[in-house]
Amino acid sequence: MKKRFFAAFLACSMVLGVFSGCGETETTESQESETLSTGETVSTQGEEKDSVVIAMGPTSEPEAGFDPAFGWGAGEHVHEPLIQSTLTVTNTDLTIGYDLATAYSVSEDGLTWEVTIRTDAMFADGEPLTAEDVAFTYNTVKETSSVNDFTMLDYAEAVDESTVVFHMTREFSIWPYTMAVVGIVPEHAYDSATYGANPIGSGRYILKQWDRGQQVILEANPDYYGEAPKMKRVTILFMEEDAAFLAAQAGQVDLAYTSATYSNEAVSGYRLEAYQSVDNRGFNLPAIASGEETESGVAIGNDFTSDVLVRRALNIGVDRQEMIDNVLNGYGTPAYSVCDQMPWYNSASQVEYDPEGAAALLDEAGWVMGSDGVREKDGVKAELHLLYSNGDSVRQALTADFASQMEALGISCSMEGVGWDTAYDRALSTPLLWGWGAHSPMELYNIYHTIGDTGSAQYSPYSNETVDQYMDEALACSDLEESYTLWQKAQWDGETGVTQEGDIPWVWLVNIDHLYWVREGLQVAEQKIHPHGHGWSVVNNVDQWTWA
């Protein structure tokens, strides 16, 4: 433990050293730290009343830089790109609002989207942003992006300076959610080899400085077309959780990410804030029996979880609140689906903890309790092998807790940590603890919809034609809000779906609260429900933060 603390201290010291004296940006008196007579170091950052220093995890640093074509804003952890503008935005309630767009419409056949954009947006180099830039951006993203699926887009074209038309390959009613995360780049100044490190955008902030592996400094865009940012300077420090905690203790940051591990600690001058998320954790439950393989020879199916009665037993036999209390230290909410609290969530997913009911389902399935406390059926023991990702202590602890609860039901459990290089293949036959959660109903499609002619969903063996049909109809719907009902029916329509009374091919456990140490006096604006990923989402509205 001493070695770990010393390593964290060194990391914290190195990063803070960089922050206080590096590079291209002058260090002003208000950004320096003062040393009190006691030797304690405190930050005077808050004295400016218009700047903030934030500690994020190292994985939050964009490997390819700040280029929307390579995942910035729209990669695995979706967030607002800040440096660039988007056509639309997601509101606090996850409905759609406008940014660059002033209006949009979709053709009756769903294959053409027309978007009108504002005419007062300027790039940071003084050039106007036009529909040509929008079309160029989307065509570039379609051609080069390796982190997002843009197969639904055929091409984009500018029909005049303020109108862009998207020609689709198929109906895609949730296109406005895609438009909310793709930042617009300037056609006249875009070079894929250099843009990521030197982005030019029209968003709320300009990238002032980027020291790879250490920090990013953003400054308010003086020519931004919207309300002027209240926070004029935003410094992001990339550091491990231990170092972020030490930085907060030293008063060197204004907001620092943390986890339940540190939630019992107290940091003088800071409060612990918990923001709700749809950052969920859940096990896939292969819904077909073993014996099949993919074309590449990967084993598919699981004899135990292929029985729907077993899957239903697992779903009501787990005490989610106990997990939250014991693993997350109380910072989380029970998860019943991949999209809890989203506009397209079906509340029929919710279940009560019912160990007696779970035992009855296992009895009904023919799994009889043995004298050794393990159930048997036809001479076969009830066994679950559970996978979790290596190096993730929270997933490991959740897996161990789930295993303990299942053993109380008479199911013998074993655990194994695996790397993501093998996890996807292993999950086709063995339950794996996943992390999901997005601001788009497309995640339902990605998890549950049958993929092509494979006869199965992408991540776990499962298929239901009715569920597929509802999701296809949802994507083909001409009205976005009306499509929510179809997404809900895909979850449960009264007869079939992916909930407890249906096929239940996944068991969802918890939504993890995103925790932050926040300096007293810093007023963080109202947060949307955070998606998967404990990083940039918290600064989606950093321009609206203030100091009291």
PLM region descriptions:
Residues P222-A266, S412-S414:
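Ligand-site clamp/hinge motif
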Residues N91-T92, E171, T178-P229, R233, ...:
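Gly/Pro-rich hinge or "lid" segments in bacterial periplasmic/extracellular proteins
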Residues S105, D109-T112, N148-A189:
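Surface-exposed binding/hinge segments that line
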Residues A55-V106, I200:
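N-terminal lobe/hinge region of extracytoplasmic solute-binding protein
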Residues T102-S145, V165, A247, D303-S306:
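Aromatic- and charge-enriched surface segment that lines or borders ligand/interaction sites
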Residues I54-M56, G126, Q249, L255-T258, ...:
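Periplasmic binding protein-like
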Residues V53, T130-T137, E161, V165, ...:
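Alpha-helical secondary-structure segments
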Residues D211, Q215, N315-N346, Q350, ...:
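Detector for C-terminal structural segments
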